[in-house]
């Protein structure tokens, strides 16, 4: 049985998913998803403690994804990782309680440690 804390990372860029998993797999149970839709399914079938999502994705933004899951998974910590300056949407999401924190890309492994 795996007792590691579970983290879901959602990003449409495959190389980001690979890098994230490689950086954190020793300490955490890392689940990755290339889409928000797949991320929702992973949330429904796994005990996830932290969601980290990219802000800019094709089907919906990271903020929109977190808005979709906040009511079904209210106790899961939600963070946005972005390389862009979508600060208005992200700050609004933080202020409304949908997002705990945002981190800019490229991410620092020490900054992301839970």
What positions do the PLM features span?
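As written
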Residues: 27, 62, 94-100
